[in-house]
Amino acid sequence: MNRLAKQLKFLLAAGILISFSTVGLAQFPGAKLTPGDTLKSIRISADKKVTLSIYAPKASEVTVSGDFLQSYGGQKLKKDELGIWSVTVGPVAPDLYSYDFSVDGMKVIDPKNIQVKEGAGGYSNLMEVPGKEADYLAVKNVPHGNLEKVWFYAGTLGKTSRVHIYTPPGYEKIKDKLPVLYLQHGGGDNDASWATAGRANFILDNLLAEGKMKPMIVVMPFGNPGSGFFSGAGVEADPYYSYFFKDLVPYVESHYNVGTSRENRAYAGLSMGGLQALNMGIFYPEKFAYVLPLSTGFFPEILQSMEEKYTSNLKNSEINKLKLFWIAMGGEKDIAYKNGENTKALFDKFGIKYQTNSYPAGHTFITWRHNLVEFAPILFR
């Protein structure tokens, strides 16, 4: 290509870029820039105080809720003369938090923040407060595994199902069969939640890079394949368990390089997923070596039904053959704390052996991420 042709090519490219830039600035003919166009919705000061803002000039009330607040419920924002609503809270400890705005009673996500958590009930925003305490979930210069969204046909459901699957760094070169951790979300979330709000893949990357855990495949399924959140006693009426054992496990074991014995399987779940973990330990103990319910426990009426209808299951000696039955809670402010204590009392009554753990951050992903940091290194040893 001669010099003139190169110059013409450069000028043409520059003209296209300028044209697109002009369109981007103008947006639409006659449109005017608003304070919201240049708004930075999250500002974190040196002392870790967080200011959240949203442009809503016609709103009469705006609140924000999230797990960075010290209590449940929303915090009111104040409106300035430009129509920007803001609130400053903190200092906020370094970690990853979710939040939602409510504008005149309507939940809205932050339009200036592309970091979101996908859930069964919609989207929430994510906000990272940097600092040493948040190092465990940081995206570091270490080997990274792959996080895949996988769609497959589930015969028991008669439809296609989605699952998130993590494979460790260098998976393609690993010849040995790998163990599998099935990692279940809670009632308001879906199969993406452990990867977004949970940051599971980055946490596992960091633990592997530090030599703290064994390589494993992590399967994050959707936990509500039926009509919704099922919390009844037993497993017969919930389509999840048929889906899990007849569709999901066979798919994973036929498409990935994994071991198929109980010693190669672990199951962990939070909240609703924790109830499913409890059921796995009680009704399917021969299928797993590790069962880890997080921030959960049976409701009082379910405990009574369990004791009346499923005595033989609670007395099953296979339960105590689990290498680990690990029940973790988010401290006394965890909304499932009382149910968890009552469930442990039932286990004590039937001689079911278990270990306990607590991270005092309540019923939040802050607790569950730290749970993952603690239990992942224990598995498959």
Regions found by a protein language model. Give the residues of each.
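Bacterial N-terminal signal peptides that target proteins for export
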Residues: 2-12
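Bacterial N-terminal signal peptides
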Residues: 11-23
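Bacterial Sec-dependent signal peptides at the C-terminal "C-region" and cleavage site
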Residues: 20-32
